[in-house]
Amino acid sequence: HSEGTFSNDYSKYLEDRKAQDFVRWLMNNKRSGAAE
């Protein structure tokens, strides 16, 4: 059970990381688009 909980928490952590990267990517795109 502890293994399942760990992998579940880890997948949640990865999802958060992906979300943050996506937001950063969006911000960069908006910035470069506005600069153009």
From Swiss-Prot:
Pfam families from the UniProt entry: Hormone_2 (PF00123)
Keywords: Hormone, Secreted
GO biological process: response to starvation
Entry-linked InterPro entries: Glucagon, Glucagon_GIP_secretin_VIP
Cellular compartment(s): Secreted
Induction behaviour: Produced in the A cells of the islets of Langerhans in response to a drop in blood sugar concentration.
Keyword set includes Translocase: no
Organism superkingdom: Eukaryota
One Gene Ontology term of the molecular function aspect: hormone activity
GO cellular component: extracellular region
PANTHER family: GLUCAGON, PRO-GLUCAGON
Function: Promotes hydrolysis of glycogen and lipids, and raises the blood sugar level.
Family statement: Belongs to the glucagon family.
Name of the protein: Glucagon-1
Organism of provenance: Oreochromis niloticus (Nile tilapia)
